[in-house]
Structure formats: C-alpha cells, structure tokens
Amino acid sequence: MNKKIIATTTLLSGFIIGLSSIIAIDYACKRPKQRKEKPLKNLSKDNELWLSQQHFEELEITSQDGLKLRAKLLKANEESDKVLIAIHGYHSYNLREYAYYLQFYHDLGFHILMPDNRAHGESEGKYIGFGWLDRIDCIQWINEIKSYFNRDLQIVLHGISMGSATVLMASGEELPSDVKCIISDCGFTSVYDEMKHEMKRSHVPSILLPTATLLSKRRVGYSFKEASTIEQVKKSKTPTLFIHGDQDDFVPTYMVYDLYNACKADKDLLIVEGAKHAQSYIVNPELCEKTIMEFMHKYVKF
C-alpha cells in the first residue's frame, strides 16, 4: 500500500512540476496577447517634432523557419555607407525602443534599420527567441540591408536588453566584414541565467527551471541552456562596447562584467551611475553619446 502511495505521489508531483514548467515557459516566452501599443519612450518635445518629420520605409524578410519579419528603415539625409541595425528588447518594438536614439545616429550620417523581433511588433511568431533564434534573424537582416544598398557598408549593431543578447549571440557566428562594431546595452549572460534570476526575484520555485529547460527545446525551439550569450561572446571577433546601469536589477549588473571578461575581441566598458535597466542613455545621454562616438571612431570611417 505504501509503495502505491509513494508511486502515485511521485507521478502526481512529476505531473505538477511538468505542467507548471510548461506554464512558466509560456509565460516567459509566448507572444503576449495583442495589447494597446505602448507609447514611445522618454521623448522630449524636440524629439517628437523631429520624429514626426521623418519618413520610414517598411522592409520584410522571411526567417529560416518561415516567419515574416518586418523592419523600419530610416535613410540618411545624404549618400552614406554607414548603417546602424538597432535591435529592441523584450516585450518592446522597434520604434519604441530606439525613438530617443534615432536623431543622434541620424545626425552622424547613419541609415538606421530597426527590425521587430520575432513574436514582437509587426513581425510574426508565436514564441519569443530571447536572442538565440533572433541571432540568425539578425544575420539575415545584415544580408538583407547589404542587398538593399548593393554596396560595401560600415555596419554597427546596437542592441538593448534582449536586443543586446541578440547582437552578442550573433557575434559568435561568422559575420560579414561589413560589420565593424557592436554597441551592447544591458545584455544577459544566458537565457538560463536570466530565467534563474527572474524566478528568484519573482519568488517562483527554482525547482521548475531544470524541468522547464528540458522541455524548452521542444516547446519553443531552443534550450535555455544552449542559448548562452557568454559562450557566443567567447567566439566573437567583433569590437564591442558594453554598457550597463549600476542600478539594473532586471539584468543584474554583474552580468556585464562576466560578458566583458569573456570577450577576446577589442572591447570597452561603460557603467552608468544611477541607471536602472535599459535606462543608461536616458540617465546620462551626454556620457553615452561621447563614449559611443569615441568607440565607433576606432572602427568606422566618418
């Protein structure tokens, strides 16, 4: 009798953990239900006026797994070989994440390509890629913009939050020589590490994470363990500027030091005092612009 009770209890516990893990995966990774479009972030009146005067082209590619992915392109005012590819973060969309950055880069003569990540904005997709699937999409966008302009380019990849993880994960792949440098703002070391941190912060039982990791490959198309930013960064040959706020509790600040130390390419590090997650530019735009400019000038011809 006791053996039957133990067996039944074990099976029931396993079922509950498995079901709870699937619920946790879907909560973190499933595309959110269509909500009212979030307003653009932290725009001044001058920013709003400037933005209202710009014309954006709409571009589209098909991902390797058949999704229609869409992007906005803001062309430079004059002939230019400089392109910024700007990758937004989790539960955001292209223009919302980068509206306050656009004028800075545009005034420097950049064409600016802003994709909507899979399962975000105008792009298709049921599950969020957390940078791992997006790294391949990012490389497709690089090739698409090369074909669009049909010339040699100087490409800078800029990512914020999950977008930062995307460009860093892409850096571990073979990138075209047109990619000159990366600006990485508040990226995480791996999907597993970020999930672990968020579970702890949200008081979700950590026992769910190993099971969720086992189930994630089948559920969302990648394992939380394999989706490692830090392992990709170790392979990177692309000069990278790492930016992080010292008050970030969503992607904890220690992660940027781990990423910086793992990077064997040319690199620099900016820690912005008083900045929470994805707030570095908002807290200190002058410092961020100065540091980005100095870094880019080493690798991009102006």
Q: Model features per residue range: what roles?
A:
Residues 169-223, 231:
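Hydrolase active-site cap/lid region
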Residues 235-237, 242-244, 248:
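Short beta-strand/loop motif that positions the catalytic acidic residue
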Residues 260-278, 291:
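Catalytic histidine neighborhood in serine/cysteine hydrolases
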Residues 128-149:
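Alpha/beta-hydrolase active-site loop
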Residues 7-62, 72:
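An N-terminal hydrophobic leader/cap segment in hydrolases
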Residues 90-104, 117:
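The serine-hydrolase catalytic nucleophile loop
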Residues 283-302:
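Catalytic active-site module of serine/aspartate enzymes centered on a nucleophile-bearing elbow/loop
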Residues 104-124:
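Conserved alpha/beta-hydrolase
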